[in-house]
Every structure is written in structure tokens, then in C-alpha cells.
């Protein structure tokens, strides 16, 4: 598995903080917590209205260094959605965040007019970095329409979850994007890696519901630590 992409924290933190503060500028004067620089790139988002999209793609190693989307994704990725919601709620992130299941239910109540948050047209941006390049269509409109079902402007997209069980090891990572739905820009992108396990039972069960629950909890915990450290 490729190593985590290095992220220059100070510039990214400043960019995210500026975007968050700009998005809230019309709501009144800033509090001291708004003005303080965040201790991690995502530590400023916990108190905001946020959307966490359902996880999109589950991939395993393919030929020639590629990562292939697996057919187990639709059955296993909702487990990651549950774990992300659970870990963040344990840290006090509640009513101001809309998680994958709630967003899907809201979209379903709209009769499909808002699209399906579980099936975004996101295949082409799996490795897209943060920057000023806007998301392509129809993805930009899909995200904007779905986020508009909530009070949020910013969205977290767990776009790709990688599971590698080669060489008797279980290695995992989830690529997470922080998106400004209004401008369709990626503000932050990173590969969050889970712990490596060499336990034969853990390796063999990685793609079972039980084994995937374990690795999903590990990944969700590491992401939640970036939002609210424990």
C-alpha cells in the first residue's frame, strides 16, 4: 500500500479555517474559538453544520499497481458509515452533523429528485488533490443538491477505502475529502491509514462483515481524532 500523502498542515489548516469563517461571515461576529488557529486541519469543523457522505468505493490491489473496485462494497461500506457516525458522536458531534444514513434517508424522502448519495459520479476524482480546480460535473451538482437538503455548506466524502491483505498482512486506508459544496472545491484530502495487522485470523476475515467492522472502527477512530482529539 502506498504511504500516506504528506500534508503541509499549517497552510491547509489556514485554508480550511478561512473557508469555514468565510462561509459563516454573514451569521454575525466571530467567537474566540473561530479566530483561534486549529490544532489539526479538521479541528475547526466540529462545531459547524457538516455533511458526511456515505463511503463510495471499496478497493483491493489489482494488477500493475492498480486498485480495483470490489463487488463487496455495497454490503460492507455501510459498516464504515455507521462507525464514522458512532465515533464522531462519541466525541460530542451530534445534531449539527448529518451522517450517511440520515442523508440517504433524506434523499429517499425526496423521491430521488436529489439523487442518491450512495452512488455519486466520483470515480474520476478518487486521487484528486485539494486545490482550486472545481469538481467535474455531474458530481459538483450532485453534491451541491444533496448538501442543500441540510443546513450545511461543507461535506466530508470518504471516497475510497483500500484493503490490502497481501504478504500475510492486513493494511487499510480511507481517502477522505473535505468539500466546499458551494464552490465545488476540495479543501483538504488525505489518506488515513489504519494499523497494520499480521494476525492470520484478522487477515483472513478482513473482507467479512465481522472483520470489516474491526478495520472500519479503526479507520473511523483515526478520522474522528482529527476532528476532536481524545
Residue ranges and their predicted role:
Residues 2-13:
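Bacterial N-terminal signal peptides that target proteins for export
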Residues 3-5, 68, 72, 76, ...:
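A general boundary/transition motif marking the beginning of the first structured unit of a protein
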Residues 3-4, 109, 167-169:
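Short secondary-structure transition/capping segments
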Residues 21-23:
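C-terminal motif of bacterial Sec signal peptides marking the signal peptidase cleavage site
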Residues 25-51, 56-62, 135-151, 160-230:
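C-terminal/domain-edge helix-coil "capping" segments
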Residues 64-155, 218:
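N-terminal segment of the mature soluble domain
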